[in-house]
């Protein structure tokens, strides 16, 4: 058994203290023959500190495309030649999407907008949409609408948004290679205000942007410092017309190493499968991740890419004897 896994068994599994950056790097560098043991330990940590339930979430785009930022992985940027163009979703369609999400047993419904940060129009639409969903659908409403001012944070709290997603995307040292129109620190400031407001913080990123293994460990440590309620893990699904459109996808075993490392760095955090798992891991790898530290999934499609049918994921959870977290358990 590698020394890092012996250390993690005592430090993380028994005492609930996450691995630091050096520990995460050691897990990320484990040879293939020790990957099953790392995943097994990560699963034991998840079961010990989070329990057996899996949180299910659906997401929908209130405003798609036309974003002024240059996030190099994103086809919604108005600066690239990708085919996504600006379009708004009407409120009845937003409510219907929430209803369909709730039918899957999901407890979370996240409203997303492709913006640097919300303007007055978006805040009005968001207020109307959140109110309509809360009146008609038994589901928690989350939001992801970019960088916020303190006034906007306060408005979201007043609306009843209980969780806010704002991904750091990658580690601080690599971020300037991925985004140049705003800084990592600006994102961190929004997250600081969200945490202070009492809303739950959802913050993760994308693996496979060109970062090194060392930078993945750096990212895990920075997320652990933030201590978010939830960490969504995406794997790059290269989008035509974007600067990263020709990047290779993450190797499945490297993705699983990352899942184990992030779980061992953050034993109590909701670790959610997000975009890209379909092409990076496939069916078998998706199962392995759920048995290796993952305890939440986004069901259905993502913002600009196709996901798996909700029934496929729900059948897998049933096969693994992993109960879907009930709404009453999240209140």
From Swiss-Prot:
Q: Which gene encodes it?
A: bioB
What reaction does this catalyse? (4R,5S)-dethiobiotin + (sulfur carrier)-SH + 2 reduced [2Fe-2S]-[ferredoxin] + 2 S-adenosyl-L-methionine = (sulfur carrier)-H + biotin + 2 5'-deoxyadenosine + 2 L-methionine + 2 oxidized [2Fe-2S]-[ferredoxin]
Q: Which UniProt keywords apply?
A: 2Fe-2S, 4Fe-4S, Biotin biosynthesis, Iron, Iron-sulfur, Metal-binding, S-adenosyl-L-methionine, Transferase
Locate the residues binding [4Fe-4S] cluster: 67, 71, 74
Job description of the protein: Catalyzes the conversion of dethiobiotin (DTB) to biotin by the insertion of a sulfur atom into dethiobiotin via a radical-based mechanism.
GO MF terms here are:
2 iron, 2 sulfur cluster binding; 4 iron, 4 sulfur cluster binding; biotin synthase activity; iron ion binding
Q: Does the keyword Iron apply?
A: yes
Where do the annotations place [2Fe-2S] cluster binding? 110, 202, 272
**Cofactor-binding details, from the entry:** Binds 1 [4Fe-4S] cluster. The cluster is coordinated with 3 cysteines and an exchangeable S-adenosyl-L-methionine. Binds 1 [2Fe-2S] cluster. The cluster is coordinated with 3 cysteines and 1 arginine.
Q: Where is each Radical SAM core domain found? A: 52-277
Enumerate the Pfam families for this protein.
BATS, Radical_SAM
- Going by the entry's taxonomy, the superkingdom of the source organism is recorded as Bacteria
Q: Which family does it belong to?
A: Belongs to the radical SAM superfamily. Biotin synthase family.
Q: Which PROSITE patterns match?
A: RADICAL_SAM
Q: What is this protein called?
A: Biotin synthase
UniProt xrefs under InterPro entries: Aldolase_TIM, BATS_dom, Biotin_synth/BioAB, Biotin_synthase, Elp3/MiaA/NifB-like_rSAM, rSAM
Matching entries from Gene3D superfamilies are given as: Aldolase class I
| Self-association and partners | Homodimer.
**Which organism's genome codes for this protein?**
Salinispora arenicola (strain CNS-205)
Coiled-coil region? none
Give the record's GO biological process terms. Answer: biotin biosynthetic process
| EC number, UniProt record | 2.8.1.6
The pathway where this protein functions is: Cofactor biosynthesis; biotin biosynthesis; biotin from 7,8-diaminononanoate: step 2/2
């Amino acid at each position: 058994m590698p020394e890092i896994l012996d250390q993690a068994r005592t430090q993380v599994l028994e005492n609930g203290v996450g691995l630091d950056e050096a520990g995460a790097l050691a897990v990320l560098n484990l040879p293939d023959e020790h990957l099953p043991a790392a995943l097994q330990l990560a699963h034991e940590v998840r079961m010990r500190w989070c329990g057996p339930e899996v949180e299910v979430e659906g997401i929908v785009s209130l405003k798609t495309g036309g974003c002024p930022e240059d996030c190099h992985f994103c086809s919604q940027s108005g600066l690239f030649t990708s085919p996504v163009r600006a379009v708004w979703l009407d409120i009845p369609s937003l409510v219907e999407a929430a209803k369909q999400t709730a039918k899957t047993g999901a407890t979370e419904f996240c409203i997303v907008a492709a913006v640097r940060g919300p303007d007055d129009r978006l805040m009005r639409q968001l207020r109307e949409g959140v109110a309509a969903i809360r009146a008609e659908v038994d589901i928690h409403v989350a939001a992801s609408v970019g960088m916020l001012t303190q006034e906007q944070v306060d408005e979201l709290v007043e609306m009843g948004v209980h969780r806010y997603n704002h991904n750091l995307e990658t580690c601080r040292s690599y971020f300037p290679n991925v985004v140049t129109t705003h800084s990592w620190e600006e994102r961190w400031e929004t997250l600081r205000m969200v945490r202070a407001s009492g809303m739950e913080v959802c913050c993760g990123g994308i693996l496979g942007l060109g970062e090194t293994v060392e930078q993945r460990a750096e990212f895990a440590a920075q997320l652990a410092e933030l201590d978010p309620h939830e960490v969504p893990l995406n794997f790059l699904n290269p989008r035509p017309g974007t600067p990263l459109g020709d990047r290779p996808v993450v190797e499945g075993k490297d993705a699983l190493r990352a899942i184990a490392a992030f779980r061992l760095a953050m034993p109590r955090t909701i670790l959610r499968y997000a975009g890209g798992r379909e092409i990076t891991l496939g069916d078998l790898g998706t199962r392995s991740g759920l048995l290796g530290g993952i305890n939440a999934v986004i069901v259905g499609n993502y913002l600009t890419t196709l996901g798996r049918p909700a029934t496929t994921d729900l059948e897998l959870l049933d096969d693994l004897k992993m109960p879907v977290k009930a709404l009453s358990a999240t209140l």
